[in-house]
Amino acid sequence: MIKLKVKKGDEVVVITGKHKGKKGKILKVFPEDSKVIVFGVNLVKKHTKSNQMSEGGIITKELPIHISNIAHIDPKTGNPTKVAFKFLEDGSKVRVAKKSGEIIGKEGK
């Protein structure tokens, strides 16, 4: 298992595949599979049976996307960027956009 540079709540864009160019927020991360679920991307319709807990019908849900197919959105420019780790003066480790040097995520606040 590799260390992922993505976290729940990050803004990302799809860079390859049939959903190329779509932007969204990460809803869930699967580190063991190196996949993420992005809101509004890779939607499928699933037919469900009714049971005691819920009605049957057709529901729309997101399927996971491999992390190699997404890129972070630079908070300063809004363009796709790579991510690096950097240590601040107080010793805390933060994720930084390589293009602009802007801190990504809540760690900088």
Swiss-Prot record:
This is Large ribosomal subunit protein uL24. GO terms for cellular component: ribonucleoprotein complex; ribosome. GO terms for biological process: translation. One of its GO terms (molecular function) is rRNA binding. Keywords: Ribonucleoprotein, Ribosomal protein, RNA-binding, rRNA-binding. PROSITE patterns: RIBOSOMAL_L24 (PS01108). It comes from Rickettsia massiliae (strain Mtu5). The gene is rplX. HAMAP family: Ribosomal_uL24_B. Belongs to the universal ribosomal protein uL24 family. Part of the 50S ribosomal subunit. It comes from the Bacteria.
